[in-house]
Design a protein with these regions (language model features):
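N-terminal leader segment of winged-helix/HTH proteins
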Residues: 1-38
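C-terminal regulatory/oligomerization modules of transcriptional regulators
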Residues: 1-8, 131-154
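Charged, amphipathic alpha-helical coiled-coil/dimerization segments
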Residues: 2-3, 28, 59, 79-139
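Active-site phosphate/pyrophosphate-handling residues
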Residues: 15, 46, 135
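Hydrophobic structural patches
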Residues: 20, 48-51, 141
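N-terminal helix-turn-helix DNA-binding core of bacterial DNA-binding proteins
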Residues: 25, 29-70
Length: 154
């Protein structure tokens, strides 16, 4: 701010949002480098992770909702994963057209390998960050996400 006066919350939040955009891009590129040897991208890895984390098989629309992603983009990635033998489609007893997405044994092996590559790298990345800073960052990002999702529903 010109004059060196105190910055408003909106100005500070704008800086946070711009930093989040840059951090997101850097994180995706970092993830791409980690999983490239496995034939994955960050986007494919994220979908595999959502499938692993789900308590049961889900249709694409549910995965997209859980990820906060566009259903069509998730469908395209799931189709690619299916072509590569990492996921399969199963009938959904509750909906004829919305098939359930299931990880194949090859998909589980690939996901496990990705986590194996990720572990040492995330440990190294976290090395100079305090637990308190990470907790505070998580709280702020969670609050922002909640507010954005709530305001998007209005």
């Amino acid at each position: 701010m010109a004059g060196g006066g105190p910055r408003s919350r909106a100005e500070l939040l704008t800086d946070v949002i711009l930093t989040m955009f840059r951090a997101n891009n850097a994180t995706l590129a970092w993830g791409d480098r980690i999983v490239a040897p496995l034939g994955l991208t960050s986007a494919r890895w994220q979908i595999l992770g959502a499938i692993v984390q789900a308590d049961r098989a889900q249709p694409v629309a549910w995965l997209a909702r859980d990820l906060g992603a566009n259903r069509q983009n998730v469908q395209r990635i799931v189709n690619d994963l299916e072509k590569d033998g990492l996921v399969s489609f199963e009938p959904n007893p509750h909906h004829k057209r919305a098939q359930l997405i299931v990880l194949t044994p090859k998909g589980q092996e690939t996901y496990d390998a990705a986590i194996g590559l990720y572990g040492p790298r995330v440990e190294a990345l976290a090395q100079d960050l305090t637990v308190e800073d990470l907790d505070a960052t998580h709280r702020v990002l969670t609050a922002l996400r909640t507010e954005l999702e709530t305001s998007a529903a209005d």
